[in-house]
Amino acid sequence: MSSLSGKVQTVLGLVEPSQLGRTLTHEHLTMTFDSFYCPPPPCHEVTSKEPIMMKNLFWIQKNPYSHRENLQLNQEVGAIREELLYFKAKGGGALVENTTTGLSRDVHTLKWLAEQTGVHIIAGAGFYVDATHSAATRAMSVEQLTDVLINEILHGADGTSIKCGVIGEIGCSWPLTDSERKILEATAHAQAQLGCPVIIHPGRNPGAPFQIIRILQEAGADISKTVMSHLDRTIFDKKELLEFAQLGCYLEYDLFGTELLNYQLSPDIDMPDDNKRIRRVHFLVDEGYEDRILMAHDIHTKHRLMKYGGHGYSHILTNIVPKMLLRGLTERVLDKILIENPKQWLTFK
């Protein structure tokens, strides 16, 4: 679209790409995660229902999806405002808010947060995984889904005039469902018409990212403007990672700060820690993919906020970047990952 071409679309309107600065490409500021509540371990039911307190924070850190209050990030708008001001003070400029239909997207709150903090916020269009799809969503054709995505970018989301600036995160399960496949095809069709950025949440299997890219390609997507999220919990084998990198999408390591003994959403996966993430990013840089890497935290629960002793949205800037420099990555490369790559991805063609 000519009016969008060369611009980035935030919840406050179009901006020049050069205005973004350091950008986190996969975060949540207001959402609910009730659909993914996990029953607590035996004899821990009482703790799971307590308010979040200092004495149970350690338990919540180990069982984040078994505490119902922890899944209500939408209750912390004031704390999020303070976090974004801190993020800006530490050198942050922009943030992509990946909450889509099914996770209680709230574009009014996103607009308020952008106005209050001066942080550029880009909202996400589309649908999360099948478990959150309504009967109406499942009944839609690819053409109808395409129209929904285009409308959320050109006219506004959720009955408002507040426009999304990316499609995604588009949720995919493993195995992929029929409804998710239709939405992927609609995503490709909408992207082909709009020239917009796309971001994908893959299923928790090493084959999922490959399958998703293939479906998008066959439906006409621009893979060079597509992000594959959560690679830190999805592709572990280096050879397999390089095979995937050759497909040309952005490679996102977006779980910085998440260091779990037990990954409740997929217990067979051993979640890497931040040192392993840093080594994996370094590996991709050494292999020539510095222009394809993106980083974020994917905060979506209360316990990861600074208010509750968590790392917050400034963790990458205050802790990860210094460690990366210590490990031999250069300022130039880190500026590429945090400034240039997000800018290139978020700019409409």
UniProtKB/Swiss-Prot annotation:
Changing L255A: Increased N-acetyltaurine hydrolase activity. Disruption phenotype: Mice show reduced food intake, resistance to diet-induced obesity and improved glucose homeostasis in response to stimuli that increase taurine levels. Complete loss of tissue N-acetyltaurine hydrolysis activity and a significant increase in N-acetyltaurine levels. One of its GO terms (cellular component) is cytosol. One of its GO terms (biological process) is epithelial cell differentiation. Changing H26F: Abolished N-acetyltaurine hydrolase activity. It is an enzyme of class 3 (hydrolase). A divalent metal cation 1 binds at H26, H28, E169, D298. The keyword Kinase does not apply. Its cofactor is a divalent metal cation. Its EC number is 3.1.-.-. Keywords: Cytoplasm, Hydrolase, Metal-binding. It catalyses: N-acetyltaurine + H2O = taurine + acetate; N-propanoyltaurine + H2O = propanoate + taurine; N-acetyl-L-methionine + H2O = L-methionine + acetate; N-acetyl-L-isoleucine + H2O = L-isoleucine + acetate. Belongs to the metallo-dependent hydrolases superfamily. Phosphotriesterase family. PANTHER family: PHOSPHOTRIESTERASE-RELATED, PHOSPHOTRIESTERASE-RELATED PROTEIN. This is N-acetyltaurine hydrolase. It comes from Mus musculus.
